[in-house]
Amino acid sequence: MRVRTLICTFGFNEKKVLVAMRSIPYSRLVLVAGKDVLDGAEYRLMVALEEKSGGTVETVIVDPFDFADCYDGVDRAIRSHLTGGDVTLNISGGTKILADAAILAAFQNGVEAYHCEESMVKLPVMRGVRFEDAFSVEDVKVMENFVEGDSTKSIGARMPDLSDASLRKSLKHLERLGVIVPALEKGEARYHSTPGHRDIAALAGRCMR
């Protein structure tokens, strides 16, 4: 019999997780949360309710303000329970950073994801498509070498092994993806990063290794 695991991001509001627990069938509950949450009455309530129903709570501790750490924690939890079982993710609890990292981990692993508050909303997850498919090796190198306010010339000077054509192609691609944005400054195009640029670069690079 396949085990059905429900993984929930969790903060200081137990109501969102309770909606998921009522709406999504599961036999094992995993909470992904920051260390501070463990001392809260909300967390103790979740553990007590699950134990009362004959279950246990597995807790994965992450830094809820560190995108990469959140992603790694959720990704490990998903992978560890996918073997011989099914995994469903609820991302309605915790910080926005934790929720964003969790949905990306769901995307990477092709598992169903929901956002549960007053009602349950299924999130789009494409099976067979992975995060790193959006980026070329050159794209990752450009992201890793990028400095705020760079021009094409200044980036190219730090990446002599990349041809001018390949560099311009990567910059245009990253611009289309919304990772960087160009701005005309003193007659020259300079690039600025969007929020999460470093996290995206680190994650894309790690996925390709």
PLM-predicted stretches and their roles:
Residues 1-86, 100-209:
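Long, low-complexity, Lys/Arg-enriched
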Residues 90-101:
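Elongated alpha-helical scaffolds
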